[in-house]
Amino acid sequence: MSRIGKKPVSVPAGVTAAIEGKTLSVKGPKGTLSISLADEVSYAIEDGSISVQPINETKRARSFWGMQRTLVQNLITGVTEGYSKTLQITGVGYRANVQGKNLKLQLGYSHDVDFAIPEGITIATPDQTTVQISGIDKQKVGQVAAEIRRWRKPEPYKGKGIKYAGEYIFRKEGKKK
């Protein structure tokens, strides 16, 4: 069994972490993030690191241990480096562009799809078939990418649709006559 929770999370210079009640707040050069703390584990901030320990040896407490440590690590990475995902659009006439606070997608429907860009997320379209999503919250960046991809998932015959950069689409052969 993995014991990722044993490793303390180092807090780099320029980042401050504070525990107030049941909330851990992390402030860094890119912004501020916070999570609510689980009751199954205890947290300690000491000399430039945050350590997470289970309060008892139950299966539930041990399962929360590694997850909560990873969530703390994601907060620190988010406020220092940020997260980004890239989507590739494949298909004749499929394109995307940013117009103000909306992402306009042309995906072969009879109408254009307007996707409202949420707060804390930046979307850029370097070209018409590439969408770059970035932000400091890993969960929110992934959620926005999944919502955009949901409008036209890649199909296995021609590969048309929206896919993550680097994603492999399993291709099928068409019917034979």
Curated annotation (Swiss-Prot):
Asked if the keyword Coiled coil belongs to this entry, the reply reads no
Q: Which GO terms describe its cellular component?
A: cytosolic large ribosomal subunit
* GO BP term (any one): cytoplasmic translation
Database matches in PROSITE patterns: RIBOSOMAL_L6_1
Keywords from the UniProt entry: Ribonucleoprotein, Ribosomal protein, RNA-binding, rRNA-binding
Which Pfam families is this protein grouped with? Ribosomal_L6
Task: Give the source's domain of life in one word.
Answer: Bacteria
Offer an example of a GO molecular function term for this protein.
structural constituent of ribosome
Q: Which family does it belong to?
A: Belongs to the universal ribosomal protein uL6 family.
Q: What does this protein do?
A: This protein binds to the 23S rRNA, and is important in its secondary structure. It is located near the subunit interface in the base of the L7/L12 stalk, and near the tRNA binding site of the peptidyltransferase center.
How is this protein organized at the quaternary level?
Part of the 50S ribosomal subunit.
Please give the name of this protein: Large ribosomal subunit protein uL6
According to its UniProt entry, this protein's organism is Rhizorhabdus wittichii (strain DSM 6014 / CCUG 31198 / JCM 15750 / NBRC 105917 / EY 4224 / RW1) (Sphingomonas wittichii)
